[in-house]
Structure formats: C-alpha cells, structure tokens
C-alpha cells in the first residue's frame, strides 16, 4: 500500500471514530470549591489553630493548605487596604487552585437608605480599589452582595440592584437575598440578563424565608450555608456566634451535596461557603461536604480532628 492510500485509510478511520460509537466526547467537568467564610475567629484558637500561636503563624496560609477557597468576611465591615488584599493574594499562591470570594461592604447592602447617588458611587469606587489586587491576580471568583431578610422584592429594590451591577460591572458579582419574595422566575431571568450569580442559601426557614435551592444564573454557581439554628436566628439578643452555632449532621450534608451536584452541572465554577463558623464548625462542614463530593476522606487539620472525632479517619 502506497503512502497516499495509507493516508486515506487513516483519515477514514478517524472520521468513523468521530461519527460513530468509537468516539465519546468528554463529559463536562466543572470545579467545586468548598471553604469557610472568614479565617480570623478568636474561638478557633485551640480548635483549629494552635493555642498561643505566635505572630509568625499565618492563618490564611494554613486554611489554603486544606481548602481551595475562602470568602473574605472582613470586607463586609470595611473595604480592606489594597496592600492587605495584595498580601492575601501572595499568601495563598502555593495552592494553585485557590480562589477568593468576598463580601461587599455593608454600606452597599445594609445601609443603603442613607446613601445618595454620589455617595453610592464613591462607596463602590472604594470597593473597587480594595479588591483590585486580588482581581488583577485572577483569583477573585465573585464579589457577593449579601442583603438582609428585610430587603424585599420590589421594583425599587430591583432598580437599586441594577445601579450596583452597573457601578461594579468589572467584577463577577453574586447576590444573596434571604426573603422568599425573591424566589420567582422573573428575578432569576433578571440576574441572567445581567450575568450575575444567584447565591443559594441554607438558613433557618422561618416565615417567608427563601429556601435552599440550586439556581444558576451565571457562569458561577454559589451556595452559602448559615446553619439551621432556629432558636437564635431571629433572636435580637443572640450574638453572632449563637446565630451561627450549628453543626450539620450527615443527612443534611448529603442533602446539600445533592443541590451542589445540580449546580455543578449548570455552572462553570461552583463555590460552597460554610458560614457556621463557631468553634470551627464551618471547617468541619466544609470537610464533610468535600468527603461526600469526592467519596474519599480529605486531609484534616489535626486539632480540628481532635475536636470533632468523626473527621479522624
């Protein structure tokens, strides 16, 4: 057989493989990153971090040894200094899969009634400057606009969201709403049109609170777990720690993993953020989720395994 005939035969074989049953296109694989909301909590000493840890101990780098994401929580209270954000980006570089998400400044979400057009623009500019080092490093997956339960579904509030989307358009945005009035198809379509992620939430479902789901409205899938502490959730006398003092049992973890798998099928990247932070329970829940997703035990911080023995395999 001459070379030309051999080439024709080879081309025919390749074509048959493509058109026939010999060729199977690869299944779509998307990334799920799981990690805690925040990394600086006093009650994590002795539970997650060593007691009496020295100034040289790097808590963020420690978290990046075990998880591929963390949600920046301090940015909710005030925009971080750009040099601090740049430091965070450097400290996670050893984990090449690592990406941040970040909560937007509370002035944009919880103190909006006092803002004017001018002050809103200035506040958004402050957020842009603060997050620029992480965004420019290519490791800011999403900026989360987290609204309280009192933020109801209305034309005025949807118009306010549009303003924020316009002012923060250079970021990949996500929106968390907690009132069930937002759980309607026109709102999800509105987010899709603006390429903004809907943040699914697991929270105590009290009254007209939004229920956990698996909505995907952009390339990013987002899910936040707040725990199910019904007793303290709306108790004004309960402190922050009490509201988020909850450890998910295995059946609830499996339920949430089912939702995450649905999100994973429809998003390019999926983020599951555990916010039940008291005494390291957010890390415990994150590890439980990772084990269910991967069907294999993840690496566990030694002190955390001592506190929560079910993690020790």
List each language-model region with its residue ranges:
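Ser/Thr/Pro/Gly-rich low-complexity, intrinsically disordered segments
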Residues: 5-6
